[in-house]
Amino acid sequence: MDYLPLIQQLGYKELHSTQLIQSLWGGYGELVRVFADKTSIIVKHIALPETQNHPRGWNTTLSHQRKINSYQVELHWYQNFVPLLHKNCSAPLPLKIVEQEHTCLLAMQDLHQLGYVDTVKEANPMHLSACLKWLAWFHATHIQNPGDKLWESGTYWHIETRPDELEALLDPVLKKHAKQIDLKLKGAPFQTLVHGDAKLANFCFTADGKQAAAVDFQYVGKGCAMKDVALFMSSAVAPQQCTEKEQWILDTYFGHLREAIDSTQPKLSYSEVEKAWRPLFCIAWADFQRFVKGWSPSHWKINDYTEALTKQAIEAINKQA
């Protein structure tokens, strides 16, 4: 791909080099760092493939349409929401969007140029706290946001967009309760916007690890904040440490949430928000477990901790039925 015309449209004179960061999921393009003049930018090059190449074989028309929708949502998000984000939940600003029939270029700031120079595969407590702070401020500042033209239900595993995986689910108890779990999350008080894919790999950090910024907003939309917290913990805490770390993760998140609500939503009662959200952590994880067990039954994210949490969620739902 020749990125010279794009950088010229942005006012740069010289294209020095490009660096492939990663190919997009399922062969839908690439993420590239472009070095131009004395700086660098990030370009998300979305190219719709003629044949779909899903790593786990879910090559369906529905899967393809979901990805197309996700890129449309992401473009809308960058154009209309990112410029309004609070500094404590920052994301790269869009620089230019070029849409053609089967391709799209999303040029955005390079977080490296803004001081977010690190990504990590293993998070220390400082990294964990930085991500939880980002999520808390993101959730607090978007409580009751209508999420115009975003996903009606955020997250890439939402049940309405995953009928194939639900059909493949071999856990009869979880399958029976799947829609009740979803309805419980949809009915949660203080609905907000969720990132939708808040895994550790989608956060970049300052060199000291104290601040995080997030990327990859294909599945941003309305929902219960605990969905993001559960997905994040599933990606950032080893299964054998989850039981021990759960209380710390939740306390850290809610500590940041208190500060964020007090600062940005003075008309809301923090204690009411926490009272409504904290019990939904296990429900949100059970919702994710429903997807993973249908999608990839031998996945490492299915383990004793997640099974116990799912059981806890189903028991809670049955008590309230």
How should these model regions be labeled?
Residues 103-114:
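Conserved short submotifs of the Hanks-type protein kinase catalytic core
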Residues 27-36, 42, 181-227:
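Active-site acidic catalytic loop and adjacent metal/ATP-binding pocket
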Residues 129, 255-321:
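Helix-rich C-terminal or lid/interface subdomains of diverse kinases
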Residues 94-98, 145-156, 264-271:
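Short, glycine/acidic-rich hinge or "gate" loops at secondary-structure transitions
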Residues 50-55, 115-117, 223:
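Short acidic/His/Gly/Ser-rich catalytic and metal-binding motifs that mark active-site loops
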Residues 114-195, 204-207, 301:
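ATP-dependent phospho-/nucleotidyl transfer catalytic cores
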Residues 63, 76, 222-263, 284-303:
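Active-site activation/catalytic loop segments of kinase-like enzymes and analogous catalytic loops
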Residues 1-101, 206-207:
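Conserved NTP-binding catalytic cores of kinases and kinase-like/nucleotidyltransferase enzymes
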